[in-house]
Amino acid sequence: PLTLFRIPALILIGFYRNTPAIVHFFWSYYALPIVSPLTLSPFAAAVLALSAQSAAFYAEVYRGGIQSIGAGQWEGAKALGMSRVTALRRVIFPQALRRMIPPFLERSFELLKSTALASSLAYSELLYQAMQINSQTYRPLEVYSLIAVMYFTLLLIISQGSQLLERRLAVSDTR
């Protein structure tokens, strides 16, 4: 029964991982209304595009984390009489989670940076606002430098927090 879902999932994951996010933005906003009765606002199209692409990348993080756990862990859980689901929940996933955090956080940073692409749909996110201000003030150096500093500051704070989390989990892993 899982094979029914595996092939479509692999195709979707491959598609979203191997095409640029801007294509997903444009397709969600301009092409989706042509092939379906849905007409999305720029915000909804941006959310749909980012969600679909991020789901594909996060799925790979989960897959990689679970596959990184040795077969001996599965065998040990089976020897203890655990079902596959119980083994995954109690043995495999807690170990895999520690390994998944760095790529999960990295993808989250990429997701945050990708929100700037929403400006291509005329959605008023940070970069779009900067373009509007620049068109009124004709001060691109100041405007775009400020935006760069804002993104850098936000991501630096998140990055520092993620490093603390990684250190905390690494310490708890060695106990």
Residue ranges and their predicted role:
Residues 1-175:
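Transmembrane alpha-helices and adjacent helix-loop boundaries
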